[in-house]
């Protein structure tokens, strides 16, 4: 595992660098998750033909530091991603973001401009309002969530993702969830459809139908579907996700 000190976050950010050929695929995880947990089974699949992959744990999550003073908004996380890629001197990349990470990837792609060869977002938050998970968190005050809601959420969680959740700072979860509920202006949907790089939306078959997916297809952007998977597609069908990503390179 690698690390660098983020001046924007005021903390150390950690990531995996799976060495390989070609422009790297940058994996950005969702709320309460960690790329170090979600994506090794995906990037190690032989179908990706040894493509270099960078798996970042955003500030507040996974192995990265969890500073109390950081904002954790989508824009804040996108700025750290760009700072990190600048530090690595990455001149061209493919951005992949899941859920909250999809929104982060969209904002990062705007900042990176022509350095982004392709943007792949998997069930991202494209509009204000959040989803079930983020609304449940943001429906509490930050103090209440830190004091009580976070532990209640941990107690209720039974999926393998509980390990990621318990390695997520409650203040990062609350501020990230609140940012998703508040949304952005212009919306992430508007930003996504107007980006000039190649773009693809990924959905798990069990998550369809979806209004957001229909809106993106109507805008002329390709939709790829992961069979036998829902929102947590990297856990549910990593081989199929690897195949879809490989087909987009």
Predicted regions and their residues:
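Conserved HGGG/HGGXW glycine-rich cap/lid loop of the alpha/beta-hydrolase fold
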Residues: 9-63
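Conserved alpha/beta-hydrolase "nucleophile elbow" surrounding the catalytic nucleophile
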Residues: 29, 93, 97-102
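Conserved catalytic-core motifs of eukaryotic protein kinase domains, centered on the activation segment
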Residues: 32, 37-39, 64-70, 130-133, ...
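Active-site loop/oxyanion-hole signature of alpha/beta-hydrolase fold enzymes
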Residues: 54-96, 243
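Flexible "cap/lid" loop of the alpha/beta hydrolase fold
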Residues: 103-111, 115-148
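Conserved alpha/beta-hydrolase catalytic His-Asp/Glu region
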Residues: 130-197
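Conserved serine/cysteine hydrolase catalytic core
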Residues: 170-229, 234
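Post-His helix in hydrolase/transferase enzymes
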Residues: 235-247
């Amino acid at each position: 595992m690698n690390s660098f000190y983020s001046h924007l976050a005021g903390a150390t950010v950690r990531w995996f660098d799976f060495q390989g050929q070609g422009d790297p695929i940058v994996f950005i995880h969702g709320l309460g998750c960690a790329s170090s947990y979600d994506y090794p089974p995906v990037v190690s699949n032989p179908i990706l033909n040894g493509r270099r992959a960078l798996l970042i744990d955003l500030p507040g999550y996974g192995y990265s530091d969890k500073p109390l003073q950081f904002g954790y908004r989508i824009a804040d996380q996108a700025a750290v991603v760009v700072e990190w890629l600048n530090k690595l001197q990455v001149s061209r990349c493919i951005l992949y973001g899941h859920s909250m990470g999809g929104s982060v990837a969209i904002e990062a792609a705007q900042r990176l401009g022509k350095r982004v060869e392709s943007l792949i977002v998997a069930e991202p938050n494209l509009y204000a309002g959040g989803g079930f998970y983020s609304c449940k968190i943001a429906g509490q005050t930050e103090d209440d969530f830190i004091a009580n809601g976070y532990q209640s959420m941990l107690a209720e969680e039974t999926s393998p993702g509980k390990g990621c959740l318990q390695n997520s700072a409650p203040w990062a979860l609350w501020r990230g969830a609140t940012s998703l509920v508040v949304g952005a202006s212009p919306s992430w949907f508007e930003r996504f459809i107007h980006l000039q790089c190649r773009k693809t939306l990924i959905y798990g078959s069990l998550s369809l139908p979806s209004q957001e997916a229909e809106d993106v297809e109507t805008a002329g952007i390709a939709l790829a579907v992961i069979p036998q998977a829902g929102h947590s597609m990297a856990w549910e069908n990593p081989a199929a996700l690897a195949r879809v990503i490989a087909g987009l390179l």
